[in-house]
């Protein structure tokens, strides 16, 4: 794929960043002033394929991962589904051959991957990744949230001595290098594409961030810090802060809240922070016990997956999810995630997008 004509180039320097983005709220979406999609739908589809193929290949090389097949649904009784913040309802059904067995569409594969690593006999320093597709029926729809989730879910076996902040940062930097390589690839492929990612990620803990901006909400802190630094990794998501609040909710049974975090970039189109990856070193038996107790969810210890963890039957791992559509939206500098994925939207959102030059797929 060579250079595109100026009329359909992905313009950042010439168009999107030549003015200050002043957004007017349209209910659940934001329309950046003067925004218009810079490619038609077919050109966008070609660019999406280009980004996904390149990013997936480079991620696999950086983290030493092998692609495997993944399920769309799991049995509720296994405890393998991701409970997210604990309030989201999974899409559930029964199948004819297993009456009475509740089957759930996955929210993510955070726990399933760890079981797969054991079953497939993956060695330390090696890992797996999947093309994960999920339905999150309770998402609040906006520019960056959809009920359809597509991400690379990855997991890698580690040793006990790797369970520390320095190793977590090392993996984050490897992932960020893939973002930088993908950006460079786009700059070579597209005329007038201006690179905008900073050279490195800035790391901060959720408590340090609260200390820095104690007077504002956690979301506003993310915006403030991301705007200043461009690419940030907020560590220790889910743990209780000194304010007796949590920076954000996180399920107690996959990430160790002391050894996890969110990779967030500053999105100049929407003039806001954008989370592109959530990841962490996973719980061991000790941290699982502690976190379940903290949230009064000790009944989960009776589930098959949790029993295996408490009995130290699963490998120690690090893993996470990287949003495919969000990466495409971000690197192509689109205003709405519906420009890079086919999903369902309210009539109001569709009407506002059509009126304001946003081409939903």
Regions found by a protein language model. Give the residues of each.
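Extended, charged alpha-beta segments that form solvent-exposed binding/catalytic grooves
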Residues: 125, 130-220
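Class II aminoacyl-tRNA synthetase-like tRNA-binding/catalytic domains
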Residues: 27-145, 153-157
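Short, positively charged low-complexity motifs
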Residues: 2, 19-23
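Generic recognition of stable, solvent-exposed alpha-helical segments in well-folded globular domains
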Residues: 46, 50, 54, 163-170, ...
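A generic secondary-structure signal for well-formed alpha-helical elements
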Residues: 59-66, 175-186, 335
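A translation/RNA-centric and nucleic-acid-associated enzymatic feature enriched
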Residues: 135, 205-361
